Amino acid sequence: MVNRWRGDVALVVNGQRRVARLTLGALAELEDALEEPSLVALVERFEGHRFSSRDVLLLLAAGLRAGGTEVSAETLAQAEIEGGPVAASQAAAALLARAFVVPV
């Protein structure tokens, strides 16, 4: 079940609905993989539209792993994501946004 307050985002991969979320560990993994020095730099990279399709794959793969699905960016690159690249980019943006939302 998707819990937006926990930062969950639903994504359909190869016909199966998956839940992704960005935990602190997933964010640290992304900083390392994308060679960004901080969380702020990571977010600014995406907010400033300076990201690549590889960045989206790395973000989604980290989020899916944190949500309980073991997948690499390389495997995800070969998978069918429902909605294609647009849906993948939207899911990546939602993951980042929800990771920093404070529940009220």
Segments predicted by a language model, with ranges:
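Charged interaction scaffolds used for protein-protein
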Residues: 1-12, 37-54, 65-104
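Generic recognition of short, well-ordered alpha-helical interface segments
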Residues: 22-25, 51-55
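Short, surface-exposed, low-complexity cationic segments
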Residues: 24-41
